[in-house]
């Protein structure tokens, strides 16, 4: 959740990584708008009802009408028009993020993607430059030109199989060497008069030139998938170890993230045909990552981003576990991200063939097994650490394993 005065302070992939509302200065305001927007999208609420419900809440919080910003400039806060834009933008980005996820899951069967514009009087001429063009799913063009590509963009992507392409004699294009980048002005700083600039990508085709709108130079789907990876890459540039550790812990403690993980568990637990798609369960902290590297003498290095796939959730929820009395309840599986965030114990399993991290909640006698780094198939592919199992644990056995040297205590006390 990010707070900002100007939308261009949250350019590109931040739109997919954080619910952002320009000029929201209170976390309570932002949380209220986010909650109402998520509910509206989930329930199919119309714009009028959305605005009618949200306006009195925002007025009560003092986020409505005109006000002075921190520099004394007059700014427009909440308004029906702004709320309408918020709802429309979040609806379209949510739709395309979900569509991207589905297409990535099926990319082996449908490895070609076709750009489809609406092609009516409202369609931007630049977007028509890509209409009907087909590129491989792994072509770099989709990193920045997967819709939406501007405010109000209605374009979409259609996935095609090898058979469909060959049987219909369709032409496959490549963006290799064709993509260009240029600067675009997205705003003016009222205090300094300085132009606020960002980078946008463009490509020329035989149908014209396609240029992404300022602030949309990213893929909403891959950005949502790659949230934690991108955050970690940024955090590794922070030289202050304590600050880096505090930031990771703050991310791990996010209630919104815990709820998202719990919702994912409840939606996938017991589902037939579990896939390799995954959900973030948190981040491996700096101290634990350093301990893993030290204890393995550099043989193992945590990737820091911790995920759980549908397949591993299904494995943890196996009949074997439940028949053996170690299976968890749905609520306990949903609590895995909380155990990762604040474990009672963190251990390293030194047994040959294991070499895993173990997160334990002593009160609930639950252990979460982590593969560092992940060796299993996941979609989309990414360098991560992965939760491979979770079940009830006998704490007396944990003590025996520690005494015998099979486990090494990295954090916590028995």
Curated annotation (Swiss-Prot):
Natural source organism: Haemophilus influenzae (strain ATCC 51907 / DSM 11121 / KW20 / Rd)
Listed name of the protein: Mu-like prophage FluMu F protein
Similarity comment text for this entry: To phage Mu protein F.
Functional summary from the UniProt entry: Involved in virion morphogenesis.
InterPro entries, per the entry: Phage_head_morphogenesis_dom (IPR006528)
């Amino acid at each position: 959740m990010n707070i900002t005065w100007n939308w261009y302070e949250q350019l590109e992939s931040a739109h997919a990584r954080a619910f952002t509302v320009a000029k929201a200065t209170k976390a309570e305001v932002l949380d209220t708008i986010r909650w109402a927007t998520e509910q509206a999208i989930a329930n199919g609420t119309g714009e009028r009802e959305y605005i009618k419900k949200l306006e009195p809440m925002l007025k009560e919080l003092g986020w409505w009408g005109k006000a002075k910003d921190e520099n004394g400039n007059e700014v427009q806060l909440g308004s029906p028009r702004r709320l309408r834009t918020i709802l429309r933008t979040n609806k379209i980005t949510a739709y395309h993020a979900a569509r991207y996820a589905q297409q990535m899951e099926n990319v082996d069967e449908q490895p070609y993607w076709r750009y489809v514009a609406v092609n009516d009087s409202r369609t931007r001429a630049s977007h028509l430059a890509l209409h009907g063009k087909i590129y491989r799913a792994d072509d770099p063009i989709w990193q920045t030109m997967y819709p939406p590509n501007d405010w109000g963009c209605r374009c979409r992507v259609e996935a095609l199989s090898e058979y469909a392409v060959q049987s219909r004699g369709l032409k496959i294009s490549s963006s290799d060497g064709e993509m260009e980048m240029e600067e675009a002005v997205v705003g003016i700083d009222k205090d300094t008069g300085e132009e606020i600039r960002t980078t946008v990508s463009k490509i020329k085709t035989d149908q014209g030139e396609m240029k992404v709108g300022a602030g949309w130079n990213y893929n909403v789907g891959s950005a949502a998938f790659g949230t934690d990876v991108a955050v970690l890459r940024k955090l590794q540039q922070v030289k202050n170890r304590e600050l880096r550790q505090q930031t990771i812990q703050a991310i791990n403690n996010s209630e919104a993230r815990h709820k998202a993980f719990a919702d994912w568990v409840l939606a996938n637990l017991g589902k037939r045909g579990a896939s390799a798609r995954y959900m973030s369960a948190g981040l491996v902290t700096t101290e634990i990552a350093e301990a893993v590297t030290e204890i393995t003498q550099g043989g193992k290095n945590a990737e820091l981003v911790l995920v759980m796939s549908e397949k591993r959730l299904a494995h943890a929820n196996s009949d074997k576990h439940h028949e053996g009395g170690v299976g968890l309840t749905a609520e306990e599986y949903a609590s895995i991200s909380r155990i990762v965030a604040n474990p009672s114990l963190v251990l390293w399993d030194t047994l040959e063939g294991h070499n895993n991290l173990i997160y334990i909640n002593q009160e609930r006698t639950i252990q979460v097994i982590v593969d560092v780094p992940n060796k299993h198939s996941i979609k989309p592919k990414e360098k991560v650490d992965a939760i491979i199992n979770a079940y009830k644990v006998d704490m007396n056995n944990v003590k025996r394993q520690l005494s015998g040297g099979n486990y090494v205590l990295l954090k916590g006390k028995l």
